[in-house]
Amino acid sequence: MLKINKRFLIALLTFTLPFGCVGCSDGGSATYEQISGAEAKALMDSESGYIIIDARTQEEYDEGHIPRAILIPEYEIADRAEKELPDKDQLILVYCRSGRRSKIAAEELVKLGYTNVKEFGGIIDGEYEIVK
């Protein structure tokens, strides 16, 4: 009788442990990295192959934006990202006015499969060159 119980226990563990481990993993849930304005500025100064996304409205963008920034309002990210941002591994820096919309945009980019997204808050928080 003891041998049957051992065999049953071994079979049970053999089939249940792999499923238990899968349930404990994070599933590879990707996320964006939140960085400071100073860190973003340093990346802009030292890197060349990056894209800057301005997640504000057209009117805000026209009032002044960071050089090289592409306007994609946060509510249009899902519709426009794949067409305008074909390289999902490229460094993407995201900002808005105060940081709320840039977080939403960064989260959406990650959901779409972008792997190198850094959100640096609002344009009002840093000392960036502004162009019109």
Set out the residue ranges of the language-model regions.
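Structural scaffold elements adjacent to functional motifs in cytosolic proteins
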Residues: 52-54
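Residue-level signal for mature regions of secreted extracellular proteins and peptides
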Residues: 14-17
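Rhodanese-like catalytic fold shared by cysteine-dependent sulfurtransferases
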Residues: 2-9, 19-38, 43, 50, ...
